[in-house]
Structure formats: structure tokens, C-alpha cells
Amino acid sequence: MLPRALNESSVFQSFDEARYAVDSLVPMKSDLSTLTRLGIDPSQQPNTLILTHADIVRRFVPSALLKREDLDPGVLVCLEAREACRGWEITGARILKARTGNFFADFTNFSRRSETTGWRFNALILLVNGVVVYRAWGGQPRINELEVNTNPLGPLQDIGPAIVNTR
């Protein structure tokens, strides 16, 4: 009887499935058909940001701390390809938020217990003329959070500040 919310923003069913899809890409060999076969397609994958060459330059341009030779060879190929270079930034997640515990204590605001579980995944894929030249992934494979709010006065807890503020 307590509220639940499910947030799905990925075609992948799990973090490992998303990781496997990105790890399966072979730089300098995998092409658009491989990406589509693995379920990686900006037109089908929600929350995919298509990056222009200028976006990629802003992310990887060498700075005082990072020299050109420190960059991955695939990134260098992409930067040198100029307008032939495109990138996809993929963000996916499956998050379940549920209030658990005693219905009466929750309803009367004495105690609320919220559990958040799931995963978050992000990946960056760079392509030159439709061929993958670089891929990287990261994220949170397992989210498990518990939040407990206790109000000793229950529904009366918020009345005190309301009375003080009206004077």
C-alpha cells in the first residue's frame, strides 16, 4: 500500500548487459551495423547525446595537465578526422524507489523508510565515418540506499514552524 516508483531509461536490462555491449565493440573494426546489433542506436536508445566534433574537442583537448601523447590513439584519430568524427554519450539507468515499513507509521508521518535500488550506466563511443575508434564506460553497477526519517510528533511535527512563521 506504500508508494513505489520505477525509473527506466535504458534498453538494457542490467548494468552487466550494457557493459558487455560496449566491451564487445572493437575499436577500428566495429561499425554501425555492429552497434545496432548490440542494441546501441541513438534513435532507439533513450538518453543518448550525439556529440559533434566541437563537443569532442572540448572534452579531450590537451591542457597543461594532459598532453596530446597521453590521449588514447582512438581519440587522436577522431580529433584528426575533424567533421568526420562523431560521438555518442549514452546514459542509462534502472532505479526502483520504494517506501517500505509500517503503513500506519508512514501514513501518520511518524516514520518513513525509503529504499532505492538499481544501477546507472554511462558510456562514450567515438566514431569516424561510421567506424568505432574509441569506447569507454563507467557508472554504478549496484545502487542500494536506505533513508529513514523519524518524526517523534508525527503529523504535528510541522505545525511548530508554521505557527512561528505566521506571527
Segments predicted by a language model, with ranges:
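Residues within mature, well-folded domains
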Residues: M1-R167
